[in-house]
Amino acid sequence: MASATQLTHRGIHLAGLYRSSWSKPLFRHLATKPILYSYWPSSCSWRVRVALAIKKIDYDIKPTSLLKTVSGHAYTDEYREVNPMQKVPSLKIDGHTLCDSVAIIHYLEETRPQPALLPQDPVKRAKIREIVELICSGIQPLQNVSVLDHIGKDQSLQWAQHWISRGFQGLEKVLSHSAGKFCVGDELSMADICLVPQVRNARRYKADLTPYPTIVRLNQELQELDVFKATHPSTQPDCPPEFAKK
């Protein structure tokens, strides 16, 4: 672990800050291990776990189920204080509680910019954000468990397949122009963090991926990276034994 004289935060030497009394609470917050409220199959939770892994941020997980029948579920007064929407993920870090996966990932990028998840080139940054929004605003919310529960069991699978396929049609076209080794060029980015969990959702709901060769290729490449393997839902502490990796 780095000593106080070695630690920096956004270019500020923390050792110098720590010597002033007003800054000691800030230093303590920065030195406190983050807590991630995560649910093992949640694609939103997986995004944040990957970002934390890429940034090499050590953290504790507090499993938070979205099933009311499981202990430690999100629908409690205690968790409502953490996340008023009672969804996952939430992250306690630097003395703050942050909710929503995309907001969390942006915070990590802005406070811990290396390794970078956004390039310096403004066009590439915009393209990455476009892909992130396409997935996180245009696809995943429409096949979220809370929506499918409202739709009803008889129609939920068809509903999920329809909206995933419709979203993937657009995503495939975007990626066919932007992709190199990864979603935008050859550098790992926020877009890749969002793609892999969404492909897992598509397979979970038995969507046909045959028409989307770029999506399939990128997913195969990305799944081989250690940051995705180590944070995979099947490796999580709250994953049921029948789904856990052997």
Swiss-Prot record:
Its EC number(s): 5.2.1.2, 2.5.1.18
Residue ranges constituting the GST C-terminal domain according to the UniProt record: 121-241
Pathway noted in the entry: Amino-acid degradation; L-phenylalanine degradation; acetoacetate and fumarate from L-phenylalanine: step 5/6
SUPFAM superfamilies: GST C-terminal domain-like, Thioredoxin-like
Swiss-Prot/TrEMBL cofactor(s): glutathione
Alphabetical UniProt keywords: Cytoplasm, Isomerase, Phenylalanine catabolism, Transferase, Tyrosine catabolism
Pfam family, one: GST_C_3
Keyword hit for Isomerase: yes
Residues the entry annotates as binding glutathione: S42, S43, C44, S45, W46, R47, V88, D100, S101, Q140, N144, V145, S146
Protein origin, superkingdom: Eukaryota
Gene3D superfamilies on file: 1.20.1050.10, Glutaredoxin
Domain GST N-terminal: 32-116
Catalytic reaction list: 4-maleylacetoacetate = 4-fumarylacetoacetate; RX + glutathione = an S-substituted glutathione + a halide anion + H(+)
GO BP of this protein: glutathione metabolic process; L-phenylalanine catabolic process; tyrosine catabolic process
GO MF entries: glutathione transferase activity; maleylacetoacetate isomerase activity
Any GO CC annotation of this UniProt entry: cytoplasm
Protein localization: Cytoplasm
Co-factor: note: Glutathione is required for the MAAI activity.
Family: Belongs to the GST superfamily. Zeta family.
Physiological role: Catalyzes the glutathione dependent oxygenation of dichloroacetic acid to glyoxylic acid in vitro. Possesses low glutathione thioltransferase activity toward 4-hydroxynonenal (4-HNE). Has no glutathione thioltransferase activity with adrenochrome, phenethyl isothiocyanate (PEITC), 5-hydroperoxyeicosatetraenoic acid ((5S)-HpETE), prostaglandin A2 (PGA2) or 2-hydroxyethyldisulfide (HED).
Protein name: Probable maleylacetoacetate isomerase 1
Organism, as annotated: Drosophila melanogaster (Fruit fly)
